[in-house]
Amino acid sequence: MATFSRQEFFQQLLQGCLLPTAQQGLDQIWLLLAICLACRLLWRLGLPSYLKHASTVAGGFFSLYHFFQLHMVWVVLLSLLCYLVLFLCRHSSHRGVFLSVTILIYLLMGEMHMVDTVTWHKMRGAQMIVAMKAVSLGFDLDRGEVGTVPSPVEFMGYLYFVGTIVFGPWISFHSYLQAVQGRPLSCRWLQKVARSLALALLCLVLSTCVGPYLFPYFIPLNGDRLLRNKKRKARGTMVRWLRAYESAVSFHFSNYFVGFLSEATATLAGAGFTEEKDHLEWDLTVSKPLNVELPRSMVEVVTSWNLPMSYWLNNYVFKNALRLGTFSAVLVTYAASALLHGFSFHLAAVLLSLAFITYVEHVLRKRLARILSACVLSKRCPPDCSHQHRLGLGVRALNLLFGALAIFHLAYLGSLFDVDVDDTTEEQGYGMAYTVHKWSELSWASHWVTFGCWIFYRLIG
């Protein structure tokens, strides 16, 4: 890259990565977008409710087949199993628990090679959405937030809602019922779809091109003196951390791509709005990239990574597990997240590490906030908080320190998602040896720092 002139570099970047990536992305998703729009227009015709539910089931089935062909049978089997359990337990007050156990057994059987690993992992996104919707519906029925057990066509319409079945996000049963009512089309709705789709393509391009083009072009040139340090060990360490950060950034933007695309498909199909006095506010937000790339804390990162999933985990997993104690509830929540995302050693290691990092950060900052009477909690304080020190230089410095520490943790954890690993290895999941090797290269730094923070937390108690 260093031998290219600036004009040649950007020309190669445009022709070799940006345009082909954007074109391939649109080729993959245009049919799904068309189906979402068709369903949205169909629901405006004032059809009977059962036909609206049936149409979204048909659209969801077609979308699944388009992306996964006959492998979609595993998603269909899960949805049928969920409704069978819901029907059998329709008079119980523990429907959420029964559905959770059923889904847990089903997913574990799949992870234990009931199905080919690559095939199973290809389906995990759709399986995750079906599982999350079924569990949330079960608990909402138990809590009385949903009055009666939905009919089969309502249940399947919710699970296979065309705007969410492939890329997500999770939406509640109430949001689904609002979507199929066929709310009026508007400029705000179209603007939201266009904005989310444009951001999705931008993130796809950055995720794909940051590794082979952008990162090697900018970082080595700007950091040339740093990388040519006379001390070979220091140079090697810096290169490894830069590579880790490169992998992390590429992985982050691939997640933002899915997040913004799911915003576009869900909104296009008519979901993701709040009702204001005189209009609908199309305000569905899945990810907040700035809160991840420039974080206040790791807690903020975890929340902003996927807002609907964060809400689901908090409302249907963490709150139900709180009777086990706070730390145990945190572990159960991250274990549930690992299972939903598909068990692989590297993913389980990342999520387990996140559980410890976020817990230690939370309790440490809570204690510091109490001792210093300062706004240094993991989450921003409300305007009427009782802390004496809110915006002082020391408070800002401490928050910046924890923000920098969060970026450090993100680079360390993201090093496992190597941009140079082939697709087959990525689909099968990285093994224990790969995970240990990657983190050994970085001297297990994040884990040692977390342990040090925990020791400090205990000492200042």
From Swiss-Prot:
Residues linked to a lipid group, S-palmitoyl cysteine type: C187
Record keywords: Acyltransferase, Disease variant, Endoplasmic reticulum, Lipoprotein, Membrane, Palmitate, Transferase, Transmembrane, Transmembrane helix, Wnt signaling pathway
Catalytic-site annotation from UniProt: H341
Root EC class: transferase
Reaction catalyzed: [Wnt protein]-L-serine + (9Z)-hexadecenoyl-CoA = [Wnt protein]-O-(9Z)-hexadecenoyl-L-serine + CoA
Location(s), subcellular: Endoplasmic reticulum membrane
GO terms for MF: palmitoleoyltransferase activity; Wnt-protein binding
Membrane-spanning residues: 18-38, 67-87, 96-116, 153-173, 199-219, 253-273, 338-358, 397-417
Extracellular side: 39-66, 117-152, 220-252, 359-396
Cytoplasmic side stretches: 1-17, 88-95, 174-198, 274-337, 418-461
Membrane topology: Multi-pass membrane protein
Expressed in which tissues: Isoform 1 is expressed in fetal brain, brain, amygdala, caudate nucleus, cerebellum, hippocampus, pituitary, thalamus, heart, skeletal muscle and testis. Isoform 4 is expressed in amygdala, corpus callosum, hippocampus, spinal cord, kidney, liver, lung, spleen, uterus, testis. Isoform 2 and isoform 3 are expressed in substantia negra, spinal cord, heart and lung.
Record-listed E.C. numbers: 2.3.1.250
GO cellular-component term (any): endoplasmic reticulum
GO BP term, pick one: lipid modification
Purpose: Protein-serine O-palmitoleoyltransferase that acts as a key regulator of the Wnt signaling pathway by mediating the attachment of palmitoleate, a 16-carbon monounsaturated fatty acid (C16:1(9Z)), to Wnt proteins. Serine palmitoleoylation of WNT proteins is required for efficient binding to frizzled receptors.
Record text on subunit structure and interactions: Interacts with WNT1, WNT3, WNT3A, WNT4, WNT5A, WNT5B, WNT6, WNT7A and WNT7B.
Disease note: Focal dermal hypoplasia: A rare congenital ectomesodermal disorder characterized by a combination of skin defects, skeletal abnormalities, and ocular anomalies. Affected individuals have patchy dermal hypoplasia, often in a distribution pattern following the Blaschko lines, and areas of subcutaneous fat herniation or deposition of fat into the dermis. In addition, sparse and brittle hair, hypoplastic nails and papillomas have been described. Skeletal abnormalities usually comprise syndactyly, ectrodactyly, and brachydactyly, and in some cases osteopathia striata has been seen.
Similarity remark: Belongs to the membrane-bound acyltransferase family. Porcupine subfamily.
Entry protein name: Protein-serine O-palmitoleoyltransferase porcupine
